[in-house]
Amino acid sequence: MGTVIEVEATAMLVDPNQGQLKVTGVMEEEEFGRQGRTMRRRSQARSSVDNVLTVLKTSLGLRPQDYDIHINFPGGIPVDGPSAGISMVTAVASALTNRPVANHVAMTGEVTIHGLVKGVGGIVPKVRAAAEAGITKVLVPEENWQEIFQTLEGIEVIPVRTISDVMENALLQVTEQVPVPITARHHSTLLGASPKISSGIIP
């Protein structure tokens, strides 16, 4: 079963290099089994936030360190796994550049520190959830592309390889230069494979 989750981001301009980051709605730790033992580690969703900040600076040329940034996953569904990577980048980039996210687009995918989009689990349930929610365009990692996606009606599934591909398909162009406001609120739509946490995917 899949689900559609909104990702919110706000950005408030502060003194240079004095920005702070807050993330809410994600699990701080996760449990996983290995060789008959149950172990705990920092959640992959929380860890992927570090990748997001790096990509914003190195791949998109932005300065998140100059803003107080708040990323939130509303709705009471605890988020875990790396699949929220490109959604978080998109939401924050939207807030920093004042370019709105297209409201008919949803996405899923892990992002590396080099701005590459990596494959995730549960891709078919995620795409189906998007279609059922009325989404007309879905961005998926190129590694997850399947021929069956070409047969779906009413929804376009686009494979993406880099975070630049994501920005091109997710952010709307503005007709004139608009200064970034002191506080900007933007959101993107994340696809989850299940409303419950299961190891390794975002569920």
How would you label these PLM feature ranges?
Residues 3-203:
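Peripheral, non-AAA+ core regions of ATP-driven protein-machinery
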